[in-house]
Amino acid sequence: MDTETLKKNLQEKMDKALKVLDHELKGLRTGRASVNLLDSVTVEAYGSKMPLSQVASLSTPDARTINVQVWDKSMVSSVEKGITIANLGLTPATDGQLIRLPIPALTEERRKELVKLAHKYGEDTKISLRNIRRDGNEELKKLEKDNIIAKDEHHSLSEQVQKLTDDYSSKVDSAIKQKEQEIMTV
């Protein structure tokens, strides 16, 4: 493996870690309605579990409501059950094939819990980044040991790997800070 491929692989892995963080943060509830809240909801449909988005269309008519338009009338009760089981703190109100989910305002205590959870997600992502850095540095040591790169080049590349890790770590910090502001805004 050459050094360019190594750097590219490290960057791809770090991008993937950031995408995972982004997905986790989208699932955190802010005071606003967002269809992303329902990403984790699965529904018992036609003998198997399916994501909610495959049995209904989701929309947000206003900042405090999510509408779930179920396509098959026989699925309405399964969708309600799936939303309830997901334990999102949402109470479904059914009107024919339309399920309305009013989003209650977050309490101060719940906001603080969500901020803690966001920080935990951020810390988990930073741990992933450090593990990726460690793997990259081990690969560099192996390349040096196999006389593919010189000691000076190894040192220079290690610094580049560290800089890459620092850059991604600061991206994590800014994503967490932004989510914290979203959550704490009443």
UniProtKB/Swiss-Prot annotation:
One of its GO terms (molecular function) is ribosomal large subunit binding. Disulfide bonds: none annotated. It is found in: Cytoplasm. It holds the Pfam family RRF. InterPro entries: Ribosome_recyc_fac, Ribosome_recyc_fac_dom, RRF_sf. One of its GO terms (cellular component) is cytosol. It comes from the Bacteria. Keywords: Cytoplasm, Protein biosynthesis. The keyword Transferase does not apply. NCBIfam families: frr. Belongs to the RRF family. HAMAP family: RRF. This is Ribosome-recycling factor. The lineage of its organism: Bacteria, Pseudomonadati, Pseudomonadota, Alphaproteobacteria, Rickettsiales.
